[in-house]
């Protein structure tokens, strides 16, 4: 990642801390990966605190594929099969079958309905029958170990919301430009500033976690 673009947002560690503060305050975070990976920015929110207004913003400015990042334990609890047995996507993104709340939704596609689905999936004691399949929310299974195992937006989301003190569940969606193309770092940074989001890179988070684990050992 071009550090010149990020220098005004502090050091890598400061950017992670700002991201955690943003989540604790109920705000979103823009998570950037490297130019030689997906080269995109994802809007992420803690699943516990995401509002209908934030979901609407995500749908309006994102790819439309709103994803709910979950741990393997939660995936098993909800009995969500993986979308395919043999994942041949470039980065092995862990899509499960799509979901919809079994109660409290209409078509399932509105911002309010998608928030209802997210809340149903992360509720304490949630069970498979609380969700219908397919639906308009795309669960993603994070790899154990987070970004230290796989440097993806899914793992970054789980790591960030967990470090911020929330349940290990977060919502993400890729930012797109008005013409439908994928937003790159300059556009992502501008959008984040306009919408009071913190900005962090996956590289920042990897360094942060490694340093904290080194100090803990």
Curated annotation (Swiss-Prot):
Q: Which cofactor does it need?
A: Mg(2+); Mn(2+)
The pathway this protein participates in, as annotated, is: Cofactor biosynthesis; riboflavin biosynthesis; 2-hydroxy-3-oxobutyl phosphate from D-ribulose 5-phosphate: step 1/1
GO cellular component terms, alphabetically, are: cytosol
Instruction: Locate the site labelled Essential for catalytic activity.
Output: 136, 174
Q: Which reaction does it catalyse?
A: D-ribulose 5-phosphate = (2S)-2-hydroxy-3-oxobutyl phosphate + formate + H(+)
Extract one GO BP annotation from the record.
Answer: riboflavin biosynthetic process
The record's disulfide annotation reads: none
Q: How the cofactor binds, per note? A: Binds 2 divalent metal cations per subunit. Magnesium or manganese.
Alphabetical keyword list: Lyase, Magnesium, Manganese, Metal-binding, Riboflavin biosynthesis
Residues annotated for D-ribulose 5-phosphate binding in this entry: 37-38, 42, 150-154, 174
Gene Ontology MF term list: 3,4-dihydroxy-2-butanone-4-phosphate synthase activity; magnesium ion binding; manganese ion binding
Which InterPro entries does the protein's record reference? DHBP_synth_RibB-like_a/b_dom, DHBP_synthase_RibB
* Residues given in the record as Mg(2+) 2 binding sites: 38, 153
Give EC number(s), comma-separated.
4.1.99.12
Amino-acid positions noted as binding Mg(2+) 1 in the UniProt annotation, renumbered to this chain: 38
The record describes the protein's role as: Catalyzes the conversion of D-ribulose 5-phosphate to formate and 3,4-dihydroxy-2-butanone 4-phosphate.
Family annotation (PANTHER family): 3,4-DIHYDROXY-2-BUTANONE 4-PHOSPHATE SYNTHASE (PTHR21327:SF38), GTP CYCLOHYDROLASE II-RELATED (PTHR21327)
Subunit composition? Homodimer.
- Similarity field: Belongs to the DHBP synthase family.
According to UniProt, the name of this protein is: 3,4-dihydroxy-2-butanone 4-phosphate synthase
């Amino acid at each position: 990642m071009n550090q010149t673009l990020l220098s005004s947002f502090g050091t890598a560690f400061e950017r992670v801390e700002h991201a955690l503060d943003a989540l604790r305050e109920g705000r979103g975070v823009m998570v950037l990966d490297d130019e030689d990976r997906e080269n995109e920015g994802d809007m992420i929110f803690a699943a516990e605190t995401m509002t209908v207004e934030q979901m609407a913003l995500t749908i309006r400015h994102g790819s439309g594929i709103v994803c709910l990042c979950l741990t393997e334990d939660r995936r098993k609890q909800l009995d969500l099969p993986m979308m395919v047995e043999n994942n041949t996507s470039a980065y092995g993104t862990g899509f499960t079958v799509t979901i919809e709340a079994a109660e409290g939704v209409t078509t399932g596609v509105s911002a309010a309905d998608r928030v209802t689905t997210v809340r149903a999936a992360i509720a304490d004691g949630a069970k498979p029958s609380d969700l219908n399949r397919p639906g308009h929310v795309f669960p993603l299974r994070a790899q154990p170990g987070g970004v230290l195992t796989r440097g993806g937006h899914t793992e970054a989301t789980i790591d960030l919301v967990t470090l911020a003190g929330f349940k290990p569940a977060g919502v993400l969606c890729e930012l797109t430009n008005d013409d439908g193309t994928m937003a790159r770092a300059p556009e992502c940074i501008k959008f984040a500033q306009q919408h009071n989001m913190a900005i962090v890179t996956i590289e920042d988070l990897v360094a942060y976690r490694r340093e904290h684990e080194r100090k803990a050992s």
